[in-house]
């Protein structure tokens, strides 16, 4: 059996999980998330403990088993604690600011780049060189952070660009003169 899928998922206090066929709705202090899972996966809730079972040991069911358990675990964590992803802007004159709900990036282009977050995603700018993406859905937080990073990915020669907090950029040496 999948090691991840076998793990029992304890539902913390303040979080309610409701099952309707294979649609799981998780409500908590930070919000509500709903997702429909594969009909072959059997999801059960007993005494504040959620389990995911699979019908057979074929390859697809083994893969779905652990994935389903992980996604539900992330939903529970998201509505109770939330997720956040930090980004840093490195480069002379590179800065971020917030205009209403939009994130405005000045990263060396002839124009400022505006990014509008999806519903349920919050963008904070604690300083001109730091951006924090927050939300309840781990996938959407990561995707939004990746979209922001893609505006100006770190380049390997000077290391300029937008990078994740703590990301190490592999540096290259420039051309050597003869």
Curated annotation (Swiss-Prot):
Q: Kindly list the GO CC terms recorded for this protein.
A: cytosolic large ribosomal subunit
Q: Give a GO molecular function annotation for the protein.
A: rRNA binding
What are the UniProt keywords, alphabetically? Ribonucleoprotein, Ribosomal protein, RNA-binding, rRNA-binding
List the Pfam families hit by this protein, alphabetically.
Ribosomal_L6
Which Gene3D superfamilies does the UniProt record give?
Answer: Ribosomal protein L6, alpha-beta domain
One biological process term from GO is: cytoplasmic translation
Superkingdom assignment: Bacteria
What is the similarity comment for this entry? Belongs to the universal ribosomal protein uL6 family.
This molecule's function is given as:
This protein binds to the 23S rRNA, and is important in its secondary structure. It is located near the subunit interface in the base of the L7/L12 stalk, and near the tRNA binding site of the peptidyltransferase center.
Q: Which PANTHER family match?
A: 60S/50S RIBOSOMAL PROTEIN L6/L9 (PTHR11655), LARGE RIBOSOMAL SUBUNIT PROTEIN UL6M (PTHR11655:SF14)
| Subunit comment | Part of the 50S ribosomal subunit.
Protein's recorded name:
Large ribosomal subunit protein uL6
Protein's organism: Bacillus licheniformis (strain ATCC 14580 / DSM 13 / JCM 2505 / CCUG 7422 / NBRC 12200 / NCIMB 9375 / NCTC 10341 / NRRL NRS-1264 / Gibson 46)
